[in-house]
Design a protein with these regions (language model features):
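Internal catalytic-core helix/loop-beta-alpha segment
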Residues: 98-125
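Generic beta-sheet signal
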Residues: 4, 126-136
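Short beta-strand scaffold positions
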Residues: 49-50, 114, 132-133
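Active-site signature of alpha/beta-hydrolase-fold catalytic machinery across serine-
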Residues: 61, 140, 144
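Acidic, low-complexity terminal tails and accessory targeting/binding regions
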Residues: 38, 68-72, 78-90, 125, ...
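Glycine-rich phosphate-binding loop signature in dinucleotide/nucleotide-binding domains
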Residues: 41-43, 123-127
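Short active-site segment of divalent metal-dependent hydrolases/proteases
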Residues: 12, 137-138
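Active-site-proximal alpha-helix that buttresses catalytic centers in soluble enzyme cores
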Residues: 2-72, 94, 100, 104-107
Length: 189
């Protein structure tokens, strides 16, 4: 069974509108150090990341702690947006109401879901990996595993959150979220 810990990037500096170059805030860098301590105990065999700076900067200290490199993968980018949207919340609501909705040159929640699933299907069945990721992408996988809860999950997902997916024969068999207070994973499925 493959185990994938999807690590949402820590708090980004949203004053930087360039999606690829948006860095973490000082609070985000502190969140990353908390992740290093929380995830130190897990025997990861590989680290992957979206190539976006905020995801790479979140996962790299964890990979460094494990003595492993980070492999950037284009399949792991955040949902492609048509542009910087002043009405972001309205756009997001519409996308979660209709998983196929998007404005060009962006992409739909369903397209993000398919892209991420193709990455997961390519992992070895014995993989234990951590992935530097994004809120919409992670929530799209939750939606695939438990239809109807993706938007609610997205609306509650904090920065530097960890979502664990366990897959067997191409199916999500377990889904859990990291609970920092109890320092354990809470099972959703």
């Amino acid at each position: 069974m493959a185990t994938i810990d999807l690590v949402r990037h820590a708090e980004p500096d949203i004053t930087i509108h360039d999606d690829f170059l948006r860095p973490l805030t000082s609070a985000g860098r502190r969140q990353t150090q908390q992740l290093v301590a929380s995830l130190h105990q897990y025997p990861y065999t590989a680290f992957f990341s979206s190539p976006l700076k905020r995801a790479v900067d979140t996962i790299t200290p964890i990979a460094d702690d494990h003595g492993l490199p980070v492999q950037k993968n284009e399949l792991l980018v955040e949902r492609k947006m048509p542009a910087w949207l002043p009405n972001f919340s309205d756009y997001v609501n519409q996308q979660w109401q209709d998983l196929t909705f998007f404005e060009k040159p962006g992409e739909s929640i369903h397209q993000v879901q398919e892209r991420y699933l193709s990455f997961l299907y390519g992992l070895p069945s014995s993989a234990f990996v951590a992935v530097g990721s994004h809120g919409t992408a992670i929530s799209s996988l939750v939606e695939a595993a438990i239809p109807g809860i993706g938007y609610h999950f997205f609306s509650k997902l904090g920065y530097a959150a960890v979502t664990r997916i366990e897959m067997h024969a191409g199916n999500v068999v377990h889904l859990a979220v990291w609970e920092p207070k109890s320092k354990t994973f809470k099972v959703l499925k």
